[in-house]
């Protein structure tokens, strides 16, 4: 399913970038204080199986925000060329102000219109963190990501997915209303973005539905892994790749199917 259009005054796919513009600095401070947020991004980047410290590789970080996922890719592939892309100009401004090696750059673009910003193939890997549930047409986005990849190259979608588990939904709602939403309001003066985060996760695909999307949009070797801690069966790495050319050696993807949650 595609995300519903937002009601007037509510955050949704059509205006989420503007909401992140308004809350960029407080959002960066919040995620900066969350150690597991950064460690889980690093785990997703490592799960892509990028070889040789990324030497000679060209990687995309879609939905890079203020650069946390970019840093995760850089940690996994320090010798790669990495391009971070985000639709929020204020989030990108914060990302650009951080210290990066020469191989890292940033582009202001919407993930559903990458070509107009000069983002064209081919890439050796794509990381898309906390992005797909914010897009109006996730299938179209996945097809575009597939077209940007070299044959055999991986896509890692780092995302919340709770729809398949009543337990996961309950934990997610408890954490949001007990911690995330109050803390977001305290830091920024408004809870709107953090209420949107809560709602958008509940509305997003379950694990089975999203893996079906990936298969339907051309990805092969699709598998899922989750994370330890309270985020288990709440945050996932969805891994897949563009089909390789015949006789191409397989990539070293860390593709392990995750056990389903038990309610």
Model-flagged regions — what are they?
Residues 31, 161-215, 226:
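C-terminal alpha-helical "lid/dimerization" subdomain adjacent to the S-adenosyl-L-methionine
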Residues 139-154:
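A short glycine-rich, Lys/Arg-flanked "PGG" loop and its adjoining helix->strand segment in the class I
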Residues 112-126:
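A short acidic, Gly/Pro-enriched loop at the edge of an enzyme's catalytic core
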Residues 124-138:
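A short SAM/SAH-binding and catalytic strip from SAM-dependent methyltransferases
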Residues 58-114:
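Class I SAM-dependent methyltransferase SAM/SAH-binding core
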Residues 35-55, 72:
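Conserved alpha-helix/loop element of class I SAM-dependent methyltransferases that forms part
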Residues 217-220, 226-261:
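Core SAM-dependent methyltransferase catalytic element
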Residues 1-26:
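N-terminal, positively charged/glycine-rich alpha-helical extensions of SAM-dependent methyltransferases
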């Amino acid at each position: 399913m595609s995300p519903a259009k937002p009601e007037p005054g509510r955050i949704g796919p059509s205006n989420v970038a503007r909401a992140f513009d308004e809350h960029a600095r407080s959002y960066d401070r919040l995620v900066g204080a969350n150690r597991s947020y950064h460690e889980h991004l690093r785990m997703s980047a490592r799960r892509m199986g990028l070889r040789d410290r990324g030497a000679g590789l060209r990687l995309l970080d879609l939905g890079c925000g203020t650069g946390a996922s970019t840093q995760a890719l850089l940690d996994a592939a320090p010798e790669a060329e990495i391009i971070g892309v985000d639709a929020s100009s204020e989030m990108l401004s914060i990302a650009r102000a951080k210290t990066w090696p020469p191989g890292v750059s940033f582009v202001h673009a919407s993930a559903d219109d990458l070509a107009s910003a000069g983002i064209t193939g081919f890439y050796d890997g794509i990381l898309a963190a906390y992005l797909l549930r914010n897009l109006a047409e996730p299938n179209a986005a996945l097809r575009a990501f597939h077209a940007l990849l070299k044959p055999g190259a991986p896509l890692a979608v780092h995302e919340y997915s709770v729809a398949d588990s009543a337990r996961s939904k309950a934990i997610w709602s408890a954490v949001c209303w007990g911690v995330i939403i109050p803390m977001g309001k305290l830091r920024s003066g408004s809870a709107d973005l953090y209420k949107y985060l809560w709602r958008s996760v509940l509305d997003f695909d379950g694990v089975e539905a999203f893996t079906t999307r990936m298969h339907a949009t051309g990805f092969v070797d699709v598998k899922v892994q989750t994370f330890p801690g309270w985020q288990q069966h709440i945050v996932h790495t969805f891994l897949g790749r563009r089909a390789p050319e015949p006789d191409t050696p397989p990539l070293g993807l860390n593709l392990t199917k995750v056990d389903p949650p038990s309610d």
